[in-house]
Amino acid sequence: MPGVIPSESNGLSRGSPSKKNRLSLKFFQKKETKRALDFTDSQEDEEKASEYRGSEIDQVVPAAQSSPVSCEKRENLLPFVGLNNLGNTCYLNSILQVLYFCPGFKAGVKHLFNIISRKKEALKDDSIQKDKGSCKEDPLASYELICSLQSLIISVEQLQASFLLNPEKYTDELATQPRRLLNTLRELNPMYEGYLQHDAQEVLQCILGNIQETCQLLKKEEIKNLTEFSSKVEEKSLQKEETGGISSTETDSTRNLDDLKEQLPKGNWKRKSDGESGNMKKKVKLSRESQPLEENQRQTRSKRKATGDTLEASPKIIPKCVSENESAKPSQKKSKVKINWLKPATKQPSILSKFCSLGKITTNQRSKGQPKVNEGDLEEDLEKDGRDNTVNGSGPASPGSSVTPVDSSEAKSINKGAEQIGFELVEKLFQGQLVLRTRCLECESLTERREDFQDISVPVQEDELSKVEESSEISPEPKTEMKTLRWAISQFASVERIVGEDKYFCENCHHYTEAERSLLFDKMPEVITIHLKCFAASGLEFDCYGGGLSKINTPLLTPLKLSLEEWSTKPTNDSYGLFAVVMHSGITISSGHYTASVKVTDLNSLELDKGNFVVDQMCEIGKPEPLNEEEARGTAENYDDEVSIRVGGNAQPSKVLNKKNVEGIGLLGGQKSKADYELCSKASNPEKVVGTPFTDSRNSETNDTNGTQESDRSKESSDQTGINVSGLENKISYVVQSLKEYEGKWLLFDDSEVKVTEEKDFLNSLSPSTSPTSTPYLLFYKKL
């Protein structure tokens, strides 16, 4: 018995510390032994502690969204739209703000989007005729970036105009989300997946590179269409030359019959002049074939009936069937050879053309499953022939088929130059040309090699300092004289002497010689992008976050005006003015925060955009959203909710991520509070929160496509704003006038926050006297 007692005491002594340790882990702030042994009190304390923690969490969120802050935001709200940070996307937001204010960029994107929308409609028509499989998905994927940019531009313009029209409806910050563009970049380059910080210069090159590829693709397709169109014109001109004598001898009462003759293969009418019996058999055969196609061709026949033709029923049926044969003729490569056969002889080619037409009729009998497409081709051929008749003077075309096609041909000739400019958007705005000139020091011969460039990377300090710092264990901040931007450009375009082992092989001297190599500007773009090399490789052990790239905070004197005549191949008087700067604050390339400073100028260009604002918000809002089968599953609102956070494609993981990892995500990207990131899941579109009349029309337009319904919606939107269309134009002029108040001022875009910066403060931040952590990273100069 006495031995049992110590064993129990030992058991208690061994058991009680384990209980204390287990409870002390839950309540490490209160380590009292009495409460640790009392289980009832511990459960009550646990419930109280959980309630207390819940109250603390509940109290943190309203503190960030207090009412005085919102009141200050409402008072200081500027009529310029910011971009929400979607998780370390400050690098993208700063570049998008610069591109938005870049002169000519919005007009070029809009022009490309209009071309793409027509291409998409043509692809839909082709899908009815032929199933091309995956061939149609590649161009759509390349068009996605242009459509995403246009959608973002429209949303920014709408939000800006609606704020100026109804400022009292905005209770939160004026910002929108570039979610669709971000997901497009992630599809084009998987490097942008996740929520890591990236380089602003790299994302700029990615955007411009994809736009350039899209322009090249559109240009190739346009050239292909022009060659096909020219081949059609050549074939029809050759056919008209054959029947020129016959049509000139016809009387005025049979001019409509002349038009029908030109629709037919020319050999048939020559065969009719030789013998009438053959054509009678042909008419009977054609009339039999046209009966099953009569229902599908009522629309075309009604157009021709409305013209007032005095022909009988059988002549109306003949040109329709044969013109269908002509519509298939340009797609065959052997048609040109057959037309060349028709040239030398006058009688015999009519027999060959007769057999050719019979062969095409048999093919039309086999392909009866495509009457609608053939009908569309028939209308196009009739319209083109009508235009040719009016030009050549062979006879007036019918009014129903000649009025509108002439306008379309004139539009093509007028817009041809605009399309060429639109296809060269990147080349005209951002791309220049460098000349790498090498001069042999023995024979004085020159060799030149040209390269395209979209930005200029210049140093911010001398290279010798880095060599000195490598030898020393301690790397103090270099104390040198203030360098200027002209010095940096001179280092970029400096003359390099090639000596020693790196001698130049001269083709004139036929041996290795010493040479001088220089870099000059041959062609300058409208916008010069200067990349300051603020990040340098460092072998420091504590630099574990930057990947060996540390920040160089050496200040560089940056002028507001710049001339590159000193480094040009030919004399020029072009001068450039600074209009945008991307700033970086931080110590490494993979951390920190990006902001953009933009100077508000050229509001006349904004006035042109606002003049088209009524058209955009009535007609083009719903077009950019559904691009392929995956995105066509829902509207833009559902699209944003589906891919707000790429965890599993569902909405629940996004909520969990918002609750747990908001603080960790927002530190590097520059989020000031949780509300800036939670806006991604709570409100997928800030326009939806505001509830402006423009957004109501946008949501309704994505579901309907009829012109009558669009006109009704335009009337409803005008009723909601209390003004008509002319009143909207007056409001738009008021919008532009209110924006002119900020002309010449510098705006600081810090994600969703927009502030006005005085020019003195901006110059101090641009060329500081000390070495701050916030330094310029990208400089944008436009041609004055």
Swiss-Prot record:
Q: From start to end residue, where is composition biased (Basic and acidic residues)? A: 232-243, 252-264
Top enzyme class, one word, equals: hydrolase
Principal subcellular localisation of the protein: nucleus
Residues recorded with modification Phosphoserine? S16, S42, S67, S475, S767
Q: Where is the composition biased (Polar residues)?
A: 7-16, 389-407, 694-709
Question: What residue stretches are annotated with the USP domain?
Answer: 81-784
Quote the PTM field.
Autocatalytic cleavage of USP1 following UV irradiation inactivates it, leading to an increase in ubiquitinated PCNA, recruitment of POLH and translesion synthesis.
**Which Gene3D superfamilies does this one have?**
Cysteine proteinases
Chain intervals for the UniProt region annotation (Disordered)? 1-21, 33-54, 232-341, 363-411, 686-723
Quickly give the catalysed reaction.
Thiol-dependent hydrolysis of ester, thioester, amide, peptide and isopeptide bonds formed by the C-terminal Gly of ubiquitin (a 76-residue protein attached to proteins as an intracellular targeting signal)
Recorded hits in Pfam families, A to Z, give: UCH
Spell out the InterPro entries in the cross-references.
Answer: Papain-like_cys_pep_sf, Peptidase_C19, Peptidase_C19_UCH, USP1, USP_CS, USP_dom
One GO cellular-component annotation of the UniProt record comes to:
nucleoplasm
Keywords per UniProt: Autocatalytic cleavage, DNA damage, DNA repair, Hydrolase, Nucleus, Phosphoprotein, Protease, Thiol protease, Ubl conjugation, Ubl conjugation pathway
List the catalytic residues. C90, H593
Q: Residue numbers for the site described as Cleavage?
A: G670, Q671
From the Swiss-Prot or TrEMBL record, state where the protein is found. Answer: Nucleus
In the UniProt record, does the keyword Nucleus occur? yes
Q: What would be an example GO MF term here?
A: cysteine-type endopeptidase activity
Q: Does the keyword Iron apply?
A: no
Q: Name one GO biological process term.
A: positive regulation of receptor signaling pathway via JAK-STAT
Its EC number is 3.4.19.12
Quaternary structure and interacting proteins, as annotated: Interacts with FANCD2 and PCNA. Interacts with WDR48. Interacts with ATAD5; the interaction regulates USP1-mediated PCNA deubiquitination.
What family is this? Belongs to the peptidase C19 family.
The record's function comment reads: Negative regulator of DNA damage repair which specifically deubiquitinates monoubiquitinated FANCD2. Also involved in PCNA-mediated translesion synthesis (TLS) by deubiquitinating monoubiquitinated PCNA. Has almost no deubiquitinating activity by itself and requires the interaction with WDR48 to have a high activity.
State the name under which the record lists this protein.
Answer: Ubiquitin carboxyl-terminal hydrolase 1
Give the originating organism.
Rattus norvegicus
